[in-house]
């Protein structure tokens, strides 16, 4: 399959390795409440599940009220805002993929659940050299994945057909959103897969064990 006209990507765990900065933020939050340092694998596996999941893990909030979780989620995000560019890097292979897309003038862009106040600066700092044609955040559509509205907007702004467009992400909600938008789906198995989850159970059209594997779908 090498006639894909649009490659849409998730951000955290797909294009960028943001887990080290989330680990820093989680440890700062835990330190504020006299907890020991967090387990990196636990943090990494939760990044794509969002800040509420990270805050719940950080302070053992699984059985607490939504209001308490939200309070500490905001605390975590305030810390993250100050450290979100410290250690975040591009995943191995992503630079090659994006260069190939740009060189061949194939449409691509980013659809993320990350709020724009964080995503915009991180994308500019880490991916600005690749000139992403679009960055779509929940703020833009009033919904988060697995709702497909972000992907539908991506299809609209890029003037792309769903049947010739792929969405690649590292969580089942990415695959669900892609399916709802009637797009081809790809699982980034190298990303932040939740512990005890199985990428193969997501039933995506493609599975990429490394970012460089995506190149197999790009026309030569």
PLM features: residue spans?
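Active-site neighborhood of HAD-like aspartate-dependent phosphohydrolases
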Residues: 1-45
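Short, acidic loop-to-helix structural element flanking the phosphoryl-transfer center
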Residues: 3, 81-110, 116, 120, ...
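Conserved Lys-Pro-Asp/Glu-containing loop-to-beta segment of HAD-superfamily phosphomonoesterases
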Residues: 6, 145-175
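Helix-loop "lid/cap" segments that line or gate small-molecule binding pockets
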Residues: 29-30, 50-65, 122, 154-155
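Short acidic capping loops at alpha-helix termini that bridge into adjacent secondary structure
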Residues: 37-42, 67-68, 130-134, 162-166
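Metal-dependent phosphoesterase signature
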Residues: 57-96
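A short, structured active-site edge motif that brings together acidic residues
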Residues: 129-144
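Acidic, Mg2+-coordinating phosphoryl-transfer loop and its flanking beta/alpha structural elements
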Residues: 166-206
